[in-house]
């Protein structure tokens, strides 16, 4: 009976618009935090990894994540163990000594290769975080499906039990911000909008961080003076020559076929197929450029050594 009364009290609180979350609420993740999460997730493949997020709750619509740190735990393909409280306390003390005095705003973990959603173990872990802070966020990142220019990541929070009992909307809608992103079908199957809802994610980048990210994999001028092994270069040249001979045979065969085709058939004959002429030209140009650069590099290095 007491449990039912507590649930009813929670539902009354949740029915007021002032006490409900908003669909406009956005999690802002810094560049360094995102890079750390991706690097940690890729290092743990094929196992799951987890860590804690540091930041602040700016207002009712903004959660700012400025940094993350990894947690030592064992994981399986679908779950990770709970947080190590002793390690967390020691890590927070050491971070405060470096000037990182932000609070824990949630946790993150990886789903290598199978999308962003919360399993039953993840839901229980999130419950423990929300008992400490009702606005705690669970971020899931997929390091396998993430590619350059597109990070597969999502943020979640559990739906209030009282709202579920009274069939109330878990969040109030004051703008169209929360409706711009289409829900993932895989997450819907695993309980999205039934047990937990998705939060908007955005990224804070300063001018210096943008410059740093642009130069992350940028070629330096010194890379042009790097000497490659002559045997490997000879093997690559031989492979390129064999490839060009094969492409030339395909091109001559294509010319013979074109003689028997009409203009209408030629328009759709090679749609979606590789163009032997273009491929031959690109392969020849690439081989010539690589060999010219290799010869010039060898000459520069021989003069520099003298």
UniProtKB/Swiss-Prot annotation:
Chain span(s) of sequence motif JAMM motif: 109-122
Domain MPN stretches: 27-162
PROSITE patterns: MPN (PS50249)
Claim: Ubl conjugation is one of the keywords in the record: no
Residues involved in Zn(2+) binding: 109, 111, 122
EC top class named in words: hydrolase
Gene Ontology molecular-function annotations: cysteine-type deubiquitinase activity; metal ion binding; metal-dependent deubiquitinase activity; metallopeptidase activity; proteasome binding
UniProt PTM comment: N-acetylated by NAT3.
Post-translational modification N-acetylmethionine, affected residues: 1
GO biological process annotation, one example: proteasome assembly
Record bears the keyword Protease: yes
SUPFAM superfamilies (UniProt xref): JAB1/MPN domain
EC number per UniProt: 3.4.19.12
Catalysed reaction equations from the record: Thiol-dependent hydrolysis of ester, thioester, amide, peptide and isopeptide bonds formed by the C-terminal Gly of ubiquitin (a 76-residue protein attached to proteins as an intracellular targeting signal)
Entry superkingdom: Eukaryota
Region feature Disordered, mapped onto this chain: 1-20
Disulfide bond annotation, renumbered to this chain: none
GO CC annotation, single: proteasome complex
InterPro entries from the UniProt entry: JAMM/MPN+_dom (IPR000555), JAMM_MPN+_peptidase_M67A (IPR050242), MPN (IPR037518), RPN11_C (IPR056263)
UniProt keyword list: Acetylation, Hydrolase, Metal-binding, Metalloprotease, Protease, Proteasome, Thiol protease, Ubl conjugation pathway, Zinc
Protein's job: Component of the lid subcomplex of the 26S proteasome, a multiprotein complex involved in the ATP-dependent degradation of ubiquitinated proteins. RPN11 is the only catalytically active member of the lid and serves as the essential deubiquitinase of the proteasome.
Domain remark in the UniProt entry: The JAMM motif is required for the deubiquitination and degradation of ubiquitinated substrates.
Name this protein carries in UniProt: Ubiquitin carboxyl-terminal hydrolase RPN11
Chain's gene name: RPN11
């Amino acid at each position: 009976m007491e449990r039912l009364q507590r649930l009813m009290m929670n539902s009354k609180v949740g029915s007021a618009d002032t006490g409900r979350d908003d669909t406009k609420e956005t999690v802002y993740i810094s560049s360094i935090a995102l890079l750390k999460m991706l690097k940690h997730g890729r290092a743990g493949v094929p196992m799951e990894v987890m860590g804690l997020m540091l930041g602040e709750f700016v207002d009712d619509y903004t959660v700012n994540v400025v940094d993350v740190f990894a947690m030592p735990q064992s994981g399986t393909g679908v779950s990770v163990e709970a947080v190590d409280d002793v390690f967390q306390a020691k890590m927070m003390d050491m971070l405060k000594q470096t000037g990182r005095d932000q609070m824990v705003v949630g946790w993150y973990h990886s789903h290598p290769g199978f999308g962003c959603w919360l399993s039953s173990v993840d839901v229980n872990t999130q419950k423990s975080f929300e008992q400490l802070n009702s606005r705690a966020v669970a971020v899931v990142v997929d390091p396998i499906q993430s590619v350059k220019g597109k990070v597969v990541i999502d943020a979640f929070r559990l739906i209030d039990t009282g709202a579920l009992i009274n069939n109330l909307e878990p969040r109030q809608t004051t703008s169209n911000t929360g409706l711009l992103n289409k829900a993932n079908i895989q997450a819907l199957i695993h309980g999205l909008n039934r047990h937990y809802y998705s939060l908007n994610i955005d990224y804070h980048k300063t001018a210096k961080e943008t410059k740093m990210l642009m130069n992350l994999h940028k070629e330096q001028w010194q890379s042009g003076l790097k000497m490659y092994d002559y045997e490997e270069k000879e093997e690559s040249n031989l492979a390129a020559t064999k490839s060009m001979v094969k492409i030339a045979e395909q091109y001559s065969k294509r010319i013979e076929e074109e003689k028997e085709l009409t203009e209408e058939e030629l328009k759709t004959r090679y749609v979606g197929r590789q163009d032997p002429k273009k491929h031959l030209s690109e392969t020849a140009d690439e081989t010539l450029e690589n060999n010219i650069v290799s010869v010039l590099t060898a000459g520069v290095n021989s003069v520099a050594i003298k």
